[in-house]
């Protein structure tokens, strides 16, 4: 592209994303800071030294000044799913001097030097184990990021106007992108939850399923193989494939397929992402949950209490918390996690049952929801998610999924420290 063409593309990049950038900067500081705190906590000491080397090598001229340090820190969590959320958001803002100078906007190197200085301080705090001090620096760095996005947005809009064709932020899952058959499997699990397909009943023929979900017969066969491997369905020669949600030994989990292993690791990644962020989101969305929706959740919970099969209430509460949030970008980022959580349904029937534990946890959560205790509800939802992550991770490790060990359990003291020490005013 010529310089003029680049300039036009840069201008379009920002003017078409004004609304999304405002939404992103309204919530990113809290989510970023709390995620980075966990990432630093899990970072190995030798990686802290590597981070300092990376900071010294980071160039102001090439890209977002702290993009590479950010990616390095996030990698400590071992969760590409979570990493991709933050990296997409970072590149979405893309505050590079090249872009800004091309469209004639001032670029304050001092501001961006403070980002790198902040990461240097964070590395020092990691060495000394001062996570309270780390919270202060993370708050300052992430607040500055939000302010700079806002200033840039205003300057661009004042100078070039607001593009009427606004584009939303789109989260591209960069690592471990699901295949078509994975998405169809999740859709079928969702249809089981909705009662479209009932337990012990046969699914429609593969040809009918292919037409319904708009995929090839090969994809449907792979979908059925995936669902069979996790115990969601079973195929009977000459009869077809039926939903088979009943108690099975853990050994019946078939981990021979890479697709199955990948799907289950994906599930644990989603659980970790939820555990780290759900208290923040729940605190902000609690007051927007309608009385009608609360009644629906209570009815579902009471039905599951009668059967002692707590399969759907936790997921419906998560869905409600995410969808009730006023920030459209929060909804865009967290809504896909509802589908990822679906894999917990067949896992509940494999090996030892955790229904009693889930029942006790939901008792507490529902009582807090009824009472209107926002802080207590958000804290308990985080705790429930933390417990589920521990149980499911251990179950998959016991089944032989060794990669499950790479998904780290967030430390309770860090979850609590993040909640107590990292706060931002809403825009």
Regions found by a protein language model. Name each.
Residues 24-36, 67-75, 81-97, 188, ...:
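Short, structured motif recognition centered on aromatic/hydrophobic residues
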Residues 187-191, 195-196, 207, 212-214, ...:
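Long compositionally biased, domain-poor regions of proteins
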């Amino acid at each position: 592209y010529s310089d003029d063409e680049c300039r036009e593309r840069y201008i379009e990049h920002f003017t078409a994303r004004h609304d999304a950038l405002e939404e992103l900067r309204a919530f990113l500081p809290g989510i970023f800071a709390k995620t980075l705190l966990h990432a630093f906590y899990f970072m190995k000491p030798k990686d802290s030294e590597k981070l300092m080397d990376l900071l010294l090598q980071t160039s102001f001229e090439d890209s977002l000044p702290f993009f590479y340090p950010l990616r390095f820190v996030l990698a400590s969590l071992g969760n590409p799913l979570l990493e991709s959320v933050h990296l997409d958001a970072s590149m979405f803002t893309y505050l590079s001097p090249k872009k800004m100078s091309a469209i004639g906007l001032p670029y304050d190197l001092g501001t961006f030097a403070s980002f790198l200085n902040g990461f240097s301080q964070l590395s020092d705090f990691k060495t000394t184990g001062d996570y309270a001090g780390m919270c202060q620096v993370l708050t300052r760095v992430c607040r500055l990021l939000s302010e700079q996005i806002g200033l840039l947005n205003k300057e661009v809009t004042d100078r070039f106007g607001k593009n009427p064709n606004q584009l939303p932020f789109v989260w591209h899952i960069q690592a471990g992108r699901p295949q078509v058959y994975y998405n169809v499997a999740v859709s079928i699990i969702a249809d089981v939850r909705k009662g479209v397909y009932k337990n012990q009943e046969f699914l429609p023929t593969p040809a009918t399923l292919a037409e319904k979900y708009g995929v090839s017969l090969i994809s449907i066969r792979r979908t059925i193989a995936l669902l069979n491997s996790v115990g969601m369905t079973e195929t009977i020669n000459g009869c077809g494939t039926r939903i088979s949600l009943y108690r099975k030994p853990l050994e019946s989990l078939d981990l021979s397929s890479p697709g199955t292993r990948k799907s289950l690791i994906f599930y644990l990644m989603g659980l970790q992402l939820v555990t780290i962020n759900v208290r923040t989101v729940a605190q902000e969305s609690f007051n927007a949950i309608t009385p009608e929706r609360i009644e629906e959740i209570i009815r579902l919970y009471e039905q599951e209490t009668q059967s002692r099969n707590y399969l759907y209430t936790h997921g419906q509460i998560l869905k409600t918390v995410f969808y009730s949030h006023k920030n459209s970008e929060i909804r865009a980022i967290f809504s896909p996690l509802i589908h990822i959580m679906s894999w917990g349904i067949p896992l509940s029937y494999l090996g030892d049952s955790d229904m009693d534990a889930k029942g006790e946890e939901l008792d507490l959560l529902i009582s807090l929801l009824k009472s209107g205790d926002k802080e207590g509800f958000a804290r308990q939802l985080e705790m429930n998610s933390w417990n589920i992550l521990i149980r499911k991770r251990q179950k998959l490790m016991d089944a032989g999924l060794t990669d499950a060990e790479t998904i780290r359990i967030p430390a309770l003291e860090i979850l609590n420290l993040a909640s107590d020490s990292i706060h931002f005013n809403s825009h």
